[in-house]
């Protein structure tokens, strides 16, 4: 999980999801997981 000021899609499998007011990227590639912080 990377914590970044700006989350971006890295590949075409990445999806931007908002959970409890937190922006996240979920992907089939675990290395692409990100959270805005």
Swiss-Prot record:
Keyword list, A-Z: Ribonucleoprotein, Ribosomal protein
GO cellular component, one term: cytoplasm
Membrane-spanning residues: none
Gene Ontology molecular function terms on file: structural constituent of ribosome
GO biological process, one term: translation
The family this protein is said to belong to: Belongs to the bacterial ribosomal protein bL36 family.
Protein name: Large ribosomal subunit protein bL36
Species per Swiss-Prot/TrEMBL record: Alkalilimnicola ehrlichii (strain ATCC BAA-1101 / DSM 17681 / MLHE-1)
């Amino acid at each position: 999980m990377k914590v970044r000021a700006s989350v971006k899609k890295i590949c075409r499998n990445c999806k931007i999801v908002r959970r409890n007011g937190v922006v996240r990227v979920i992907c089939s590639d675990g290395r692409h997981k990100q959270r805005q912080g």
